Amino acid sequence: MKEYKVGILGFGTVGAGVADCLLNNADVIAKRTGIKPELAGIADLDITTDRGIRIPAGLLTTDASELIHHVDVVVELIGGTTVAKKFILQALGEGKSV
């Protein structure tokens, strides 16, 4: 089974929902798709606010550029056209799926 390390950029309401889905449904996703997603990290400027879900230690970072280096798939949930665009272009330049 193919495994993909997934990095989330942006940890607001939608980012927290995606993280929760990946953390709690990875086995279901793997069974249905043949691809096992592993939440490898979450980048956001604010990593201290409680988002209502339990995130394993070491997954939160403020360094999105560094996170991009260590994942296979980047889920961009920052929004906008400036910072988000910068990270998307970086990820694509590194051959990541976005």
State what each model feature region is:
Residues 2-4:
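Nucleotide donor/acceptor-binding cores
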Residues 11:
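Glycine-rich Rossmann-fold phosphate-binding loop(s) that bind the pyrophosphate
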Residues 6-8:
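Hydrophobic Val/Ile/Leu positions in short beta-strands of Rossmann-like dinucleotide-binding domains
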Residues 24-53:
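NAD(P)-binding Rossmann-fold cofactor-contacting core
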Residues 56-64:
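Glycine-rich, highly charged phosphate/nucleotide-binding loops
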